[in-house]
Amino acid sequence: MGQKVHPNGIRLGITKPWISTWYADKSDYANNLNSDWEVRKFLVEKLQAASVSKIVIERPAKSIRVTIHTARPGVVIGKKGEDVEVLRAAVSKLAGTPAQINIAEIRKPELDAKLVADSIAQQLERRVMFRRAMKRAVQNAMRIGAQGIKVQVSGRLGGAEIARDEWYREGRVPLHTLRADIDYSTSESHTQYGVIGVKVWIFKGEVLDGMLPQIEEPKQQQPKRKPRGK
């Protein structure tokens, strides 16, 4: 059976940046890696209502800088920035170094694979029909400007006795093209029948020489040539 490589992992260092960017000695590497995992776990649990897409961690000069990419920055910041200060103190305590927290707003959540997957998972938990949730996500992404999207749900769909998976795709999703800007993420929906897995692939365009994704022009059809002698 055909197995697919992780779309983000294969593009690291080519078109995708790492979500942890720091250098460390051999003796500190494991501690830093474990610290990153604990910080991410804490922030994801703390900011469940904030539509967090990803958390980027940097470690400049004996400190830690955390950038939270979210579609709802107001929820993270809180009233007069009080919530950010609480988060900063907690992250500093977890990491054991001075912490700085930056907020990056996601202006088009319909084009973010993690947010789309979480949205579908939440709808399934509210007993929305899975086909309706999938089709709505696909239509929204294509309307906003995606060049292609694929959504897959797996599990006891609709409370069925036998688990299965169903997928829906629109546009192009070229997984083998390394220069293609493919955003991929997963989520889980915990229903009364069990866990339903959600996978989302979004194709935003092609990255050329580190430039922003280029929107391809539709190809014009060549006029048919008439046979000679007619």
From Swiss-Prot:
Record protein name field:
Small ribosomal subunit protein uS3
**What InterPro entries would the database entry show?**
KH_dom, KH_dom-like_a/b, KH_dom_type_2, KH_sf_prok-type, Ribosomal_S3_C_sf, Ribosomal_uS3_bac-typ, Ribosomal_uS3_C, Ribosomal_uS3_CS
* PANTHER family in the record: 30S/40S RIBOSOMAL PROTEIN S3, SMALL RIBOSOMAL SUBUNIT PROTEIN US3C
What is an annotated GO biological process for this record, any one?
A: translation
Which residues does the UniProt record annotate as the domain KH type-2?
39-107
Q: What are the top taxonomic ranks of the organism? A: Bacteria, Pseudomonadati, Pseudomonadota, Gammaproteobacteria, Alteromonadales
Keyword terms: Ribonucleoprotein, Ribosomal protein, RNA-binding, rRNA-binding
Checking CDD domains in the record gives: KH-II_30S_S3
How does it associate, per the subunit comment? Part of the 30S ribosomal subunit. Forms a tight complex with proteins S10 and S14.
What functional role does this protein have?
Answer: Binds the lower part of the 30S subunit head. Binds mRNA in the 70S ribosome, positioning it for translation.
Listed GO cellular component terms? Answer: cytosolic small ribosomal subunit
Q: Which domain of life is it from?
A: Bacteria
Q: What is the species of this protein?
A: Shewanella sp. (strain W3-18-1)
